[in-house]
Amino acid sequence: MNTVSVVQFLAVVCAVFVLYGRGVFAAEGVKKAGQHKDAELCLGSDGLGHRLDEFWYNDDMCQRFLCFKDDEGIMYEQIANCPIAIAEGDCTLKPGTKGHYPDCCPAVECPPEDQKEGEI
């Protein structure tokens, strides 16, 4: 990726957006990765070396990481976090399951639209 592509990529993945109009917001971030002693590995924020284009996880924080290299050879670490979940109206917040991102993320559950209409 050239500099413009990286900026465009950052603008897209760092944008906060609403999913389904139900109050679920999501964000991802990208940061320049540190230099590992093995030039083919990316130094992750966990302090360990990781292969390019392979995912690793922090299950305690419910995060997924990916290391990639741009066209100029600069390594970046992409960090995917759980969406911010806000339950509004008849919707409820359901905790995530244990395990890797995104399964460990909480989710907003809402009754089906036809069930809501029958209540009126």
Swiss-Prot record:
GO terms for cellular component: extracellular region. GO terms for molecular function: toxin activity. The keyword Secreted applies. Expressed by the venom gland. Keywords: Disulfide bond, Secreted, Signal, Toxin. Contains 4 disulfide bonds. It comes from the Eukaryota. It is found in: Secreted. Residues 1-26 form the signal peptide. The keyword Disulfide bond applies. Belongs to the scoloptoxin-16 family. This is U-scoloptoxin(16)-Er3a.
